Structures are given as structure tokens and as C-alpha cells.
Amino acid sequence: MLRLITQSGDIVQELRRLHHRPVPSPWPVMAQVVAAMEHWAAMDQDAPPRVSGAELDAAYQRISQEKLSVIRQACAALEQVYRPQLPKTQVSFPEDGTVRGQRFYPVRRAGFYLEAKRGDALGNLLRQGMLAKTVGVAERVLVTETISSTILVAAQEMGIEEIYLAAGVPAIAMLTWGAKNIAPVESITGAGCPRVMAAKQLVSGVVTIDQTLARTNLMVLADGEANGQWLALDLLAHAEQYPNASAVLLTDRLELGEEVIQSVNRYCREQEHSVHTEKALAHYGLVAIVEDLEACGSWINEFCPHILLLAMEDPWTMVEKVQRAREIYIGHRSPSILGHYLSGANRLQTQDGAMATASELAFHCFLRSSQLLDYGNNPPPPWLKDLVNWQGLTAIEERLGQLGRLKES
């Protein structure tokens, strides 16, 4: 049962309880992961089964033209989002005659881990594949335990044809160090079970990985103009995807809060598969009635939700007060699912029953950068020579001194 709280002190106490819950540590499974890695290294490391060209071709025959069209539209939409956000090489020419800049270039080979259980498996693949494609990664590898025609077609639409049937820790090990006839990758992205996420953390010094999200909490601010059924579905959708994350609604209208709770209860009664969602909202869901929505900005910044929905007539005044939310969805008609495809919010999520894991993509997963500096004929600044002298760095001091003598000559 979704709880309703009206007392300010109780609201703060409950928000703190939800916010300060211990984050599951990867260390309890790390010993198992290390053992699995060592076992894999001791084996011959034969390549796992690879999806054949015939299977790839046949996948197109098994899906409808309508589904193919939707996949292509999703790919095009994601590229339109990603391309303007691509970091660009920057070069500046200060008046002192130096040249300074930063250059970006893609990794050569990237690996995508896809766990096709419950959750948005197709969306996870599209977000990984299109970001890497837009960046310009030449070689893209997909590993997954189970495949469907839809997944195979989506992969090919993004130029991914190297697909292996592999899962778990061995799949992460294979991507990291390679196997017979399989080259290692430079980056690994994708959400998986806790063992997979721990394995990615373990190899993060060898390859680049996406950022593991400890908990993807949701907070909704809604005024009296908000639609109660929409808000109920926002909370339900979040609990369905992230059953171990909190879903909190703050509103200044008691009637709206009661309507949301009634809608949630009705949905859970009507949907047979909603048992995990119902339990998630009972443990981590909350509807709180506040006196003033405008004063909630300090709560948002204290409890820093990953996702913030502003279902308000004038949401932009609240946006200016928010400093610690990763994703902000503005207005009554901006549910967070739109962010996956229309704003570049790149959460990757997999869920199995009451357990969910998530990670966050970013351009750095597929990009390398180099700092550029042409110092010209300028002598080093005196403070730099003093700085290295104080630390006894004699070789550096001598090298800087040579630059000064060249300028004098």
C-alpha cells in the first residue's frame, strides 16, 4: 500500500529514511567474481558461439515491416539527440602566442553487454549502439545470453554484426581480454546482474565502463492542475523498472494525493504481474502533502533525486532552484520515458523480479581525449620554476631553465 503523509516532520524523516538507505555493496559478490575470472583465465578461452550471417539475414524475415520502421525511427531520433551533443575539438590562441586545446577521438572497439530479461532490453541496446555509432566507434561487439529477431535486426540497423551468445562474468572477461579469434575491446557498457556489475568494476582499470547507478530515485512535484492518473502511472512505471529505488510524490493538494493512491491501488488489483511493483511502492513509495511546493527546492537539493518530474503549471521557477537532480522533466506532459529517446538521458536498466541494476552512458564511454599545447617561444613563468624548485624536482627545473635560455638567445 502506497503511504500518505501530511505532517512536515514525518515527511522529512521519511525522506531521510529513503535517501540514507544503505546502498548494496558489490564486495559480497566480488570474491565470486574474482574466482569466476580466474577460472575463465585457466581455461582455453574458446570463443563463445557467434550469431551466423544466415541467422542475421533470417531475422529480417521474422519481423514485420512496421516493427522495422519503428526501429529505424528510434535510431534516427537517437542520432538527432546525440550528434549536437558530441564534444568537439577545441583550440584557443591566447595573446601570449601559445596554442592550447583538446582533441576527441573514438575508441577503436567497444563491447555492449545486453541482459534480455525483463526491462527495456531493446532500448538499452539502441542507446548503447547509437551513441557508439554517432561517436564513430569502428568496431562494435554485442554479447547477450538470449537473442530475438528484434534484437538482431536492431543491432544490424546500427551496424553491429559481431554478436556472441555469452553472459555473466565470462562475457565481461572475454570482452576485456579477448579470446581465440576475438580481439579485446576498449570499453564495456550495459547493465546486468550484480555479479556482472561487480565484474565491470573489477576490470575498470583495463577498459572504460559506464557509470554504475547506486539507486535511481524518483521525486515528483505536482500542483493542483496535475492529472492524478498520469502521476500514478509515473510512480508505477518507475517502481516497475526500479523496484529497489524510491518513488516519491510531493503535492500541496490532499485530494490529488488521495486520487493517486486510489489509482495505484486499482492498477495493482487489475494487473496480475504487478506484485513486485506493489511491494516496491509499499517499501519505497510515498505520497506527501506539503504546505508550499515552492519551498520544496531545499528538499530536492538535500535528497538529490536522480529523476525529478515537475508536474506544475509554472515549472521553470522551480528549475532555477534545483541544483542536485540528474534529470529534470518539465511540465505535465514530460514523463521520464521520453528522456531515453528525446533528451539523451542514457540510463541502462535491467530488472529481474525485485532486483534491478542500472548504469549511465556518457560520451566518455566511447571517446578518448588528448590535451594539446604548443608553447611557442615563450619562457616558462617564474612561479613555475619556483614551484618545482621548492619540491626538489631538479630535472624539471633544469628543463624549464633551458626554455628560458632559448628565449634569451
From Swiss-Prot:
EC number from the UniProt entry: 1.1.-.-
Domain of life, per lineage? Bacteria
Q: Which SUPFAM superfamilies match?
A: ALDH-like
Q: Which GO terms describe its biological process?
A: L-histidine biosynthetic process
Q: Which UniProt keywords apply?
A: Oxidoreductase
Cellular component terms per the entry's GO annotation: cytoplasm; cytosol
The keyword Nucleotide-binding belongs to this UniProt entry's keyword annotation: no
Query: What is the protein name for this chain?
Result: Histidinol dehydrogenase homolog
What top-tier enzyme class does this entry carry?
A: oxidoreductase
Single annotated GO MF: histidinol dehydrogenase activity
Q: Which InterPro entries match?
A: Ald_DH/histidinol_DH, Histidinol_DH_monofunct, Hstdl_DH
Please give one Pfam family short name: Histidinol_dh
Task: Name the family.
Answer: Belongs to the histidinol dehydrogenase family.
